[in-house]
C-alpha cells in the first residue's frame, strides 16, 4: 500500500490569531514495502507529517492518498477507522500509553476494539509478543512490573496486533541505552525484511538512517529540502553539518582519513561499508608491492 502526498499544506488553528503553518507544498510517495526515514530539527514538521499518514489530521490544502483512500480538507471524519488499522503509529515513549491489568489485555485491546473475538485477540497477543522478542510467560504479568525496554516492546506489540501494513515510528529508541536501541532497531528491520512491512522512521540518529533506511526525507521549516537514498543524501556532509543534522559515525571517520590523504570510491556511511572499503584498499596495496 503506497501513501502519496500531493501539494499538501497544513496549518494549525487557521483563520485565528494563533494560525501557524506547519507544512508547505509537500509532495512525496512512501512506496509499499519501503523503509523511509524522516529527519529534521525540532519544529521542522516531522510530527505533523507523521499524523497525516493515518489521517489523525487532514491536510489544510492538497490531498493525501492512503492506499485507495483519498483524504482532502473536505473529507468527513467518519469512517476513517479502517485507515488507523492499516497504518499503525508508535509515538515517542509508547509505554506511557499502557493501561491494562495484564500484558495480554493491553495487546488485545486494539484488535477487540475493531471487532476481533476475545479468543482471536488472545492469539494475536501471544503472536505479537513473540514477534517483539518477549516470552509468552509475560502475558499474565502487569505491564508495569516490566523493565522500561520490555514495556516499550509490549506497547509496540499492541500496535502490531492491529496487523498494520505500514508501521510509523516516532523516535522509537528515545531513552534506551545503546544495547536496547540496537535490539529495537534490529527488530524493526526484521519486520521490514521478513514480513514485508512498510516502515516510516522519524529519528534524529543518522546512524540508524544509514544502517536501515532505503529512502530519507529531510524536512526544514515545513518543507522537503532533500530526498533520496541515504547513500546519495549523506554524501553531502558539509550541507548536513550546516543544517546541524549530524553525519553518520562511519562517514565522519572516513572524512578524517580523507583529510590525511586517504581516498574512497564513495564515502562509506556504515561500519560495514567502511570496513569493506578499507579491506579493499589494503588488498590493492598488497598486490601493488
UniProtKB/Swiss-Prot annotation:
Gene Ontology CC, one term: ATP-binding cassette (ABC) transporter complex
The protein's Enzyme Commission number: 7.-.-.-
Gene3D superfamilies, alphabetized: P-loop containing nucleotide triphosphate hydrolases (3.40.50.300)
Family as reported in the entry's similarity comment: Belongs to the ABC transporter superfamily. Energy-coupling factor EcfA family.
Chief location bin: membrane
Assembly and binders: Forms a stable energy-coupling factor (ECF) transporter complex composed of 2 membrane-embedded substrate-binding proteins (S component), 2 ATP-binding proteins (A component) and 2 transmembrane proteins (T component).
Membrane topology designation: Peripheral membrane protein
Coiled-coil stretches: none
PANTHER family found in the cross-reference section: ENERGY-COUPLING FACTOR TRANSPORTER ATP-BINDING PROTEIN ECFA2, HEAVY METAL TRANSPORTER
Gene Ontology MF: a single term: ATP hydrolysis activity
Organism: Enterococcus faecalis (strain ATCC 700802 / V583)
Gene this chain is encoded by: ecfA2
Residues reported to bind ATP: 40-47
Identification of the protein by name: Energy-coupling factor transporter ATP-binding protein EcfA2
Function, in words: ATP-binding (A) component of a common energy-coupling factor (ECF) ABC-transporter complex. Unlike classic ABC transporters this ECF transporter provides the energy necessary to transport a number of different substrates.
Keywords: ATP-binding, Cell membrane, Membrane, Nucleotide-binding, Translocase, Transport
